[in-house]
Amino acid sequence: FPQANFVTIDATEHDKKIAVILGLTHLINVVFANILAKDDKISLTEKMSGTTFKAQKIITESILTESPELIDTILSNPELRRYAEELWRDIGRILTATQEGKSEDVIEYIKSSKERISKNVDLEKSYKKLSTMINSIKT
């Protein structure tokens, strides 16, 4: 792995980081795959889709090439539960706010997330990378 980064951390910190790096991403994508698998008009969905959906679908499909046993091991990380519960709470919060017409709460949630993540990431650069990635693999 010539591009690999090696970091020395204790086992607890490792499990916490891997819960986000692999656990949360695998959990989200396995569930997304299950939803896509139930779409009886997937070709229409794909035809209507844009950059975000295409990128997510590729990631989801790629994860499904891994063995179910490996995915199960990744999802068995005990540290994942805390992040999954936070994800579930936030999904509920956002859906409730949208259904109750509380756009200001949703917008504030998005702005707050954007502000915090922007401290470490150039979001415009990330969007350009996404566009470049999708454009390079169009079939």
Predicted regions and their residues:
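An accessory alpha-helical subdomain
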Residues: T8-K138
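Short beta-strand and adjoining strand-loop segment in the mid-core
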Residues: F1-F6
